[in-house]
């Protein structure tokens, strides 16, 4: 029989963090003591009020809108407005089964190339390859806290081709380094100069030690996507609830993402969305202080 797998998928391996996680569980079941450094799994329980809201809505079985529960999208819009000062209206929020899926949808829909600072999360490049988007790694140094300088970013854009459709993936606090980007405004100026898009992975941004939520969208809201979710600050990784905030200028692009969502996962599970309304309705300051 001829090869059944597409070339773009043939060399795709399972996510290394998930493989490590499964191996750790296997060893623990055998009585081994394991120090887990592969997977971003919070050791803290989900806040009780959010768990109780999930329980109260466990009976719900209806399909929700493709884009997500309106009340949830409204709460996330307010959450982002408070932290970034920008208006990502609920109409521009897409609820996804984890922020990982939000990023994958972008890669599948996007017609262009991707710039990823190194070190970077293990799934960025494979996701780009699934979307047939060429990846350009941008090396960083300890001197700049493992993030590119404005000059380094500009040099990379010019070498890749400044007239191409480009997305810069920025993750702060960074996985795996844990570092926080201190020169967001500088990077935003370069991105704005060349009109490249930014995919800001903010899954850890609520967990900075100094309680400062720094987002490149504060300086470049026009073309900055934001992804986030419950996995890290809320400890609810297994609930698979994420979101994508799309800038107003890219509303047409959002239509394509919704189409992809409708033909893949349809909608995120209903009880978790109702629980997430509670999650994004309050600050949960005492809980976040504990988990930082």
Tell where the protein language model's regions lie, with residue ranges.
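Active-site phosphate-binding strand-loop segment of PLP-dependent enzymes
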Residues: 140-211
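Helix C-cap/helix->beta junction micro-motif
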Residues: 27-30, 131, 193-194
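Short acidic capping loops at alpha-helix termini that bridge into adjacent secondary structure
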Residues: 87-93, 112-113, 164, 222-223
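N-terminal small-domain helix-loop-helix segment of the aminotransferase-like
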Residues: 3-97, 279-282
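Conserved core segment of the aminotransferase class I/II
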Residues: 52, 222-292
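Conserved PLP-anchoring active-site segment centered on the Schiff-base-forming lysine
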Residues: 109-129
């Amino acid at each position: 029989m001829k090869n059944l797998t597409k070339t773009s998928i043939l060399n795709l391996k399972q996510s290394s963090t998930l493989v490590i996680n499964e191996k750790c569980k296997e060893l623990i079941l055998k009585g081994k003591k394991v120090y887990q450094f592969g997977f971003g799994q919070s050791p803290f329980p989900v806040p009780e009020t959010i768990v109780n809201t999930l329980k109260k809505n466990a009976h719900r079985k209806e399909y929700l809108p493709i884009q997500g529960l309106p009340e949830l999208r409204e709460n996330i819009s307010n959450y982002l407005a408070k932290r970034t000062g920008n208006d990502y209206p609920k109409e521009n929020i897409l609820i996804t089964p984890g922020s990982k899926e939000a990023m994958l949808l972008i890669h599948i829909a996007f017609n262009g190339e991707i710039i990823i600072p190194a070190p970077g999360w293990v799934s960025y490049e494979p996701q780009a390859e699934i979307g047939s988007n060429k990846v350009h790694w941008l090396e960083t140094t300890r001197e700049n806290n493992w993030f590119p300088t404005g000059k380094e970013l500009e040099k990379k854009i010019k070498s890749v081709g400044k007239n191409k459709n480009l997305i810069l993936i920025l993750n702060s606090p960074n996985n795996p380094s844990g570092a926080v980007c201190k020169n967001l405004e500088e990077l935003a100026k370069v991105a704005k100069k060349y009109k490249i898009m930014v995919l800001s992975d903010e899954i850890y941004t609520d967990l900075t030690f100094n309680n400062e939520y720094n987002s490149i969208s504060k300086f470049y809201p026009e073309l900055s996507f934001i992804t986030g979710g419950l996995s890290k600050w809320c400890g609810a990784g297994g609930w698979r609830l994420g979101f994508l905030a799309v800038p107003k200028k890219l509303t047409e692009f959002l239509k394509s993402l919704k189409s992809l969502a409708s033909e893949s996962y349809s909608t995120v599970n209903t009880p978790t969305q109702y629980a997430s309304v509670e999650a994004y309705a309050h600050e949960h300051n005492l809980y976040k202080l504990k988990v930082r």
